[in-house]
Curated annotation (Swiss-Prot):
PANTHER family: PROTEIN TRANSPORT PROTEIN HOFB HOMOLOG, TYPE II SECRETION SYSTEM PROTEIN GSPE-RELATED. Keywords: ATP-binding, Nucleotide-binding, Transport. Belongs to the GSP E family. This is Protein transport protein HofB homolog. CDD domains: PulE-GspE-like. InterPro entries: P-loop_NTPase (IPR027417), T2SS/T4SS_dom (IPR001482), T2SS_GspE_N (IPR007831). The keyword Transcription regulation does not apply.
Length: 461
């Protein structure tokens, strides 16, 4: 193990690497070394371990003297295996990937990039290179490099091409080795503006109206990777003024924003969503953002906060706006509580955008049942070009927005079923996700095939 890896290992267990020669590794700790540090060092190196005990003041003095810089992805650029990490991370950035998959396979490691929601392969690498790549990533993420049997999660920031880039790392034991997934976290410089989310004018007006209310619950729903986080952060940015106290509880904090009080949960330390929420309510908040409502206890705290003078924003994993009511009921939340707290529900998905440089209309238009969409849809194709490579470039969001009007509130209280509730909402002007998808196809933003890939056909069609 090289010096940067040993340095990171010592820092993980609250030590400082003083020196590493061919025979001895010299480490400083406060008071006495932990068993975890000694075990990790003995696993990582066969050299003799020498421990120097410092006072806490000495350790703090060393930390203040040490220049705090971001680690580069790879120091040993002359080594092909080390260069692999830099090439992989750089490729992900250049191709706008959201995730990097590193997977053990038979006689090789497979590397794939998720670009605009679809996985694209990079060249396979040898097992030795794959193992070395995994080990380096675990060191960067402050994971236990000696643990191969249990999943681990972490986060790290590296310097690539002169810029700080943050990643979330998750490992999973698999047949043949450990699978690693890296998620590229949103950068602080990203524009967060509700006006650029892609909502239709009426949807945007309903969203803005809900954010202007002094209290209530606003929910954003959809599967993982559907853009909920950006929608929530854009709403928080709109509300982020000097006269409003905004507090959030997240897992993890994906986009640090100046002016917000953002707390990351730490279940192993006893810092849970429920515990942080109870503490937040004693912090005189005006707006509370909950990264995700995962259980009935969190849902109940959120709803009570929304009923007592707080604007609460959160997310759920449901397929549509109306199905959100069923999901919360399954968590044990009574309908009367929902009807009094809810102000707006947003469902959303991301679809790939057609490349404007190579898109073409092909053949006959696409006919679908009139009760789904009243007119034929254009048949778009994009073969790919030097601008996009795959026919698509970027993604756009489709939204379904359900404002909780007095009529909808009464229907919720009366335990109206989901189908009837959706019928009333559509009669009042709500467009479903699929209808907004058809509108996007008409406008040439995406293809009908992409719409079906993401949403499928409506039930019964």
């Amino acid at each position: 193990m090289n010096i940067p890896q040993l340095t990171a290992l010592c820092l993980r267990y609250h030590g400082v690497l003083l020196d590493a020669s061919e025979e001895v590794v010299h480490v400083a700790v406060v008071d006495a070394p932990s068993h975890e540090l000694l075990d990790a060092l003995h696993f990582a190196t066969t050299k003799r371990i020498e421990i120097t005990c410092w006072t806490r003041q000495q350790m703090e003095g060393h930390a203040s003297r040490t220049q705090q810089t971001l680690p580069v992805a790879v120091q040993e650029k002359h080594q092909p295996k080390a260069e692999l990490l830099t090439r992989t991370l750089q490729s992900a950035l250049e191709q706008r990937a959201s995730d990097i998959h590193i997977e053990p396979a038979d006689n090789a490691y497979r590397i794939r990039l998720r670009i605009d929601g679809v996985l694209h392969p990079l060249p396979d690498v040898s097992p030795d290179a794959g193992v070395a790549l995994t080990a380096r990533l675990k060191v960067l993420g402050n994971l236990d490099i000696a643990e191969h049997r249990l999943p681990q999660d972490g986060q790290f920031t590296v310097e690539l091409a002169g810029n700080a880039v943050s990643f979330r790392i998750a490992t999973l034991p698999c047949r043949g080795g450990e699978k690693v997934v890296l998620r590229l976290l949103q950068q602080v410089g990203q524009a967060l503006d509700v006006n650029t989310l892609g909502m239709q004018p009426l949807q945007l007006a309903d969203f803005a109206h809900a954010l202007q209310q002094p209290q209530g619950l606003v929910l954003v729903t959809g599967p993982t990777g559907s853009g909920k986080t950006v929608t929530l952060y854009s709403a928080l940015q709109k509300l982020n003024t000097a006269d409003i106290n905004i507090c959030s509880v997240e897992d993890p904090v994906e986009i640090p924003i100046a002016g917000l009080n953002q707390t990351q949960i730490h279940p192993r330390a006893g810092l849970t969503f429920q515990g942080v929420l109870r503490a937040l309510l004693r912090q005189d908040p005006d707006v509370i953002m909950i990264g995700e409502i995962r259980d009935g206890e969190t849902a109940e705290i959120a709803i009570k906060a929304a009923q007592t003078g707080h604007l609460v924003l959160s997310t759920l994993h449901t397929n549509s706006t109306c199905e959100t009511l069923v999901r919360l009921q399954q968590m044990g939340v009574a309908r009367w509580m929902l009807s009094s707290a809810l102000t707006l529900v947003i469902a959303q998905r991301l679809v790939r955008k057609l490349c404007p440089h190579c898109r073409r209309q092909q053949g006959e238009p696409i006919h679908i049942p009139d009760n789904v969409w009243p007119s034929p849809l254009p048949h778009w194709q994009a073969p790919g070009c030097v601008h996009c490579y795959h026919g698509f470039y970027g993604r756009t969001a489709l939204f379904e927005v359900l404002p909780i009007t007095p009529v909808i509130r009464q229907l919720i209280s009366a335990n109206t079923d989901v189908e009837s509730l959706e019928t009333h909402a559509r009669q009042a002007g709500m467009r479903t996700l699929f209808e907004n998808g058809c509108l996007a196809v008409e406008q040439g933003l995406t293809t009908f095939e992409e719409l079906i890939r993401v949403l499928g056909m409506p039930h019964g069609e």
